[in-house]
Amino acid sequence: MPVSAQQIISVLPYRLVGGKMIVAMSVNGQERSFIFDTGGQVALTGELCDELGIPVTDSVKTTDANGKEMSLPQVTISSLLTPDGVINFTGVPAMKLASSVPFKCFGVDGFIGSNLFKNMIVEIDGKTKTILISTAEKASTISLRKMIPFSLKGYMPIITLQAGTGNNLEVLFDTGSPGFLSLKNSDYEKLQAGGACRTISEGFGGGSISVGGMVEADVSHR
């Protein structure tokens, strides 16, 4: 039966390490661990690229989840296989990260990001700690009343939430985020001015990790 006539489904288990969803994938035949990050793109540490002999093919300009703009080398992964062997992504573009230091505490070699799942259905089950990846021949069975549509801007999973009355926020559905909701300064100031939120505490520091590494310490509000 042609692939287009049947739905292909892969079950990807994950475990939590330091609040991050960690998954296993085989890169060119070598199984490695990665942070499952819907807010980012596929990225490999330079260390892994060098070990597996994955050459740089291009460069790409990007802005990471911490707002840092940069230009990174781009590589092409010949094969990225799910642990159950059901789905093999081929010719996958990925960013080559300059430093692997921030990833060592998680025991991972990079990110599995949203660009890998373009035109696919991804379901996350927190009870069984599994990620269901399926091709989109069949529509999702979830009730439309429980759905929030994604923005049509690009491939990133951007949704609109309402905070208080009349305050619409465009937010990135980001499984790599350390919290339920992180606000941009402009959104925080807008909500505070409109009485839609209040500050409980204020601190100084940073613990967010993205393709640009660790975020620089700054004032944060809770």
What are these regions (language model features)?
Residues 2-222:
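Pepsin/retropepsin-fold aspartyl endopeptidases
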